Swiss-Prot record:
Record PTM Phosphothreonine, positions in chain: T135
InterPro entries found in the cross-reference section: Ade_phspho_trans, PRibTrfase_dom, PRTase-like, UPRTase/APRTase
Name this polypeptide is given: Adenine phosphoribosyltransferase
Origin species: Dipodillus campestris
Modification sites for Phosphotyrosine: Y60
Annotated coiled-coil segments of the chain: none
Amino acid sequence: MAEPELQLVARRIRSFPDFPIPGVLFRDISPLLKDPDSFRASIRLLANHLKSKHGGKIDYIAGLDSRGFLFGPSLAQELGLGCVLIRKRGKLPGPTVSASYALEYGKAELEIQKDALEPGQKVVIVDDLLATGGTMCAACQLLGQLRAEVVECVSLVELTSLKGREKLGPVPFFSLLQYE
């Protein structure tokens, strides 16, 4: 990985203690989005990883609602691919399939349009951050319902202490930056 580019990305992640609740250290990507050079570097680094690992064997990038939408289309463009959207329940028109996942208090659902992917198509799921892995795991299950193949999940930031990568089981996972 290009170390100067990775440092450029890392310098644009801010930390806010005790947000949104006491005891949480929030990782803010807003400065990265404000800086076109840092944002381009993050996309280039993710794209280079995917090219080296999968070559031309990816059909689509799937962006997760909502901050995965910030990275998904740009990553797809960098790779010459299309991007499909995985949304929170009730946000997509037409026939959809859904998958539930647990939240701290209750549950949530993700949806994708039934015709978004064909069986056997190879997909990379992208989000800004992996924490507990609940959302990413639900996205993998959702694409499984369409019989698409999730070849990898990627994120800009991974909070390693929350062990979200373990929830993904055998699905490969990659992150640019890791924090406790």
